[in-house]
């Protein structure tokens, strides 16, 4: 599937506060060009979040309806969830700490300190924690915000640049020498993660994209001599 950058930028441009946050992010984030945890990854998450927001507003089979304020919290959380990511140099606990510090600095820079901003920071920080890996929050314990952020963090694997962006991006960040092992572990992670998806959007997207994804994944393995992984 293709990443619709226009949809993402349209929502950011139309909201002055999100626009300020995005400008802060691009000016202060030192991980924009990491092999995997980069700007493209973050924009890919935001696209899925926007789609979930739009679907929740127009479909009757959704158990929730997101308001514009919910969307802003989710976009802000996605924007900063990998802020100043270490790219494999440190644990994800450190990465999440960096993300929260970046978010706090952004909010204080734009708004100053107030009870309202402290509350916004608290909500976004808790949401961001859902992406710390290995996961520190069980799937069954996720709040709606946390579930949306975690599932969108995983759904980026369905973009057409998956092989070059995620497989080789992660390999470079992790300094991985055993591509066969990474190939197998990545498959196991994705299949397990997709089975745990609970959002209607995530389930439908996986159903529509899984055949293409798995076919490409197995062809990639065959080309490199890894063999086929069972579906």
Task: Describe every region a protein language model picked out.
Residues 42, 49, 95-138, 187-194:
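Histidine- and acidic-residue-rich, metal-dependent catalytic cores
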Residues 4-7, 17-24, 119-123, 127, ...:
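Exposed alpha-helical structural elements
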Residues 1-90:
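Acidic/His-rich, divalent-metal-binding segments that scaffold phosphate/diphosphate chemistry
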Residues 21-26, 74-80, 124-132, 148-152:
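Short alpha-helical scaffolding segments that buttress acidic/His motifs in well-ordered protein cores
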Residues 1-8, 36-37, 50-68, 80, ...:
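Divalent metal-dependent phosphate-bond-processing catalytic cores, especially two-metal-ion Mg2+/Mn2+ enzymes
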Residues 69, 76, 92-96, 117, ...:
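Short capping loops/turns at secondary-structure boundaries
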